[in-house]
UniProtKB/Swiss-Prot annotation:
Contains 3 disulfide bonds. One of its GO terms (cellular component) is extracellular region. Residues 1-23 form the signal peptide. One of its GO terms (molecular function) is toxin activity. Keywords: Disulfide bond, Secreted, Signal, Toxin. Belongs to the scoloptoxin-10 family. Expressed by the venom gland. It is found in: Secreted. It comes from the Eukaryota. This is U-scoloptoxin(10)-Sm3a.
Length: 105
């Protein structure tokens, strides 16, 4: 009985690892030039406040991820995620969050 439970959870764990490594994530994509340029412009404004710089970086990452599924999330989604906005590219369609979003709709 214990052997069966152990084998079951081992197989389940391995399947999850394989699935996790096979899906593409937003963090795995290289940052587009438009994203880095926009981030640099905002960081220049917050040069004297390092705490705001960290917050700006975090907000940009969050907005980039949100823009992948909703191009009207923020005004500059086409700069943050040109892979998905204004038109979804094959790279965009391979992302896990985009696949999940398309399944729901």
């Amino acid at each position: 009985m214990y052997k069966f439970i152990f084998i079951f959870f081992t197989v389940f764990f391995l399947i999850n690892i394989i699935e996790e490594s096979x899906t593409x994530k937003v963090e795995d994509l290289p940052l587009p030039k438009s994203y880095t340029n926009a981030l640099q412009q905002h960081l220049e404004k917050d040069k004297k406040r390092p705490d705001l710089q960290e917050l700006t970086k975090k907000n940009f990452k969050t907005n980039r991820k949100s823009c992948m599924t909703n191009c009207s999330h923020v005004e500059g989604c086409f700069l943050l995620s040109p892979e998905c906005c204004p038109k979804m590219t094959p790279t965009c369609l391979e992302l896990d969050i985009v696949k999940e979003h398309l399944k729901k709709n």
